[in-house]
């Protein structure tokens, strides 16, 4: 049984039916689909790889690859380029509905319900005294009920972000994603990522521990920090991002946690869809291959697939509390397409901190300071 039908839950259902077509898979969610979900909507190359592995790459149909990416530091240092592989931007209202349809087409049964009680007994997990399964996968998001019922602690504010997202007309010209670190609430960032269909997802996010205002204050900061955007007020939604710099146990007993419910959100970028798809797939694999001890199997699979990358991302996320490191990183990326790709991958996929990146940071800081000296802002470097 899978609780939550977002990317993590749908991936778990798809993988379970792929591995064992005759398996009985219940996909439980309180919402009707399609439904909106506050998110940055970005799918990096590794998320696309996951969709292909699940046989669900068709969910991207109608949304072209977005090749351009521009990064900006708090002092205005910019670097722009085309990463080695493009990204996609698909609104969650579309993506999630298509993934649920794919899971149903594969044979999963969708139930509109919620989980209020969990009991593990006699080799089964009983949900609300009615539904029973050998393994339950909790994929019910940042405010996971399954996680709370298991007694797994929530992320502390130092490892929890709050963000606001809206939809605005996309800027004219070649589609280009903008990720800009900003001093307001540092470490914080704004983004504008076009879907390729005339619309851009725009937003602002920062650590929960650095924000003491209300929703109106979030909206004000977004408009102030991204003045060129004009989001539809009705599209503005706030949401939490539980960063992977806090590592809770990924379940208890026969109940596994995946995606945001397992705090699998990159602390550098807020990216979560790739980690949701990957962890959902791995949770299903663990449930089917080792149903008597799925948690141990799941831990091993997660550690092998994501462990080192997430540790490196957490180290960098702590380090960029010093703004000079962000400047140094962008300065290094401006001088090397390879380092540009490494920086992007640290935020979106599988990269690790490399000796080459560390060696380039002093030169990068000098380049960034030279670019912004005297004016407080600097020209964009282009890597390729």
Enumerate the language-model features and the residues they cover.
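C-terminal helical "tail/cap" subdomain of flavin- and related membrane-associated enzymes
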Residues: 285-384
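Short, well-ordered alpha-helices that flank and scaffold nucleotide-derived cofactor binding pockets
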Residues: 14, 18, 49, 101, ...
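A conserved beta-strand/loop capping segment in the N-terminal third of enzymes
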Residues: 21, 48-100
